[in-house]
Amino acid sequence: MMQHLFEKLFRAESMSQEESQQLFAAIVRGELEPSQLAAVLISMKVRGETPAEIAGAAQALLADAQHFPRPDYLFADIVGTGGDGTNSINISTASAFVAASCGVKVAKHGNRSVSSRSGSSDLLAAFGIRLDMSAEQSRLALDDLGVCFLFAPQYHTGFRHAMPVRQQLKTRTLFNVLGPLINPARPPLALIGVYSPELVLPIAQTLKVLGYQRAAVVHGGGMDEVAIHAPTQVAELNNGSIESYQLTPEDFGLNRYPLAALQGGMPEENRDILARLLQGKGETAHAAAVAANVALLLKLYGQENLRHNAQQALEMIHSGQAFDRVTALAARG
């Protein structure tokens, strides 16, 4: 079976969703030789992965994931692929705490850094938040605090089989876009940032195949976030239909700031930057960046007015309430 799929890929043909699921199920079980895995990933990359192939791979990884007790209530993920090369502060991580303060639930799936000096997990560890919280403890945090973090390596042990090949290839592959699609809590809503504008629509189409209820995929001026220095490309999935549009900082009622204003640092520096921000004492550019991302996330919950949402987020940031959730989550260690 595998040989048939290899030959198909080497003829630059696309796999069906089912074929991709079979192939990636074998990959996470460690059944491919490193040379076979490298050949598969590169042949898919050169041709361009289809939404059906990405969805099949995501389904294989979700089927292999450790169990998380999925809640009945609405909850979301806010996550980027990373790898945008901008080394910005952890906007999506800060946004998760602010969104929870605004009254919505966020189960954030994260990992250590891809391109910035500090990924979401690096930052959380710097705040004293345990990365190895059990699924049950994380679910309780989601219930009580409105926010929890699910550390990818804890739930996706099969990823390790691909790691040596990925490190040797030193190029982006399908695995770089899979992270945001394989949240073990299986959220019905998601705001997903991607490192390239070419990925915005294909990833939205993938989310449709995966059965998300409502989601937005974004790329803003080189960043895997909603941008405040440039227009943001959006593909929004809403009950099976996808709408593509552009957003500017002005659509949120926010000022523009240069990308340099969002420069991040090492985990400890980022921790200090975000601690000040979430206590209401941060830079105005940082607050605006988080407010824009929270505003779009709130839209997925049916709060359609982006200006109102951004204002609500800014009020939460200035009140310092978001930081209370950071300390409360750290206290659960």
From Swiss-Prot:
Cofactor: Mg(2+)
Annotated metabolic or biological route of this protein: Amino-acid biosynthesis; L-tryptophan biosynthesis; L-tryptophan from chorismate: step 2/5
Catalytic activity: N-(5-phospho-beta-D-ribosyl)anthranilate + diphosphate = 5-phospho-alpha-D-ribose 1-diphosphate + anthranilate
One cellular component (GO) term of this entry: cytosol
InterPro entries in the cross-refs: Anthranilate_Pribosyl_Tfrase, Glycosyl_Trfase_fam3, Glycosyl_Trfase_fam3_N_dom, Glycosyl_Trfase_fam3_N_dom_sf, Nuc_phospho_transferase
Keyword line: Amino-acid biosynthesis, Aromatic amino acid biosynthesis, Glycosyltransferase, Magnesium, Metal-binding, Transferase, Tryptophan biosynthesis
Binding-site residues for Mg(2+) 2, renumbered to this chain: 224-225
Cofactor note: Binds 2 magnesium ions per monomer.
A UniProt-annotated Pfam family: Glycos_transf_3
Protein family according to the UniProt entry: Belongs to the anthranilate phosphoribosyltransferase family.
Identification of the protein by name: Anthranilate phosphoribosyltransferase
Lineage summary: Bacteria, Pseudomonadati, Pseudomonadota, Gammaproteobacteria, Enterobacterales
Gene name of this polypeptide: trpD
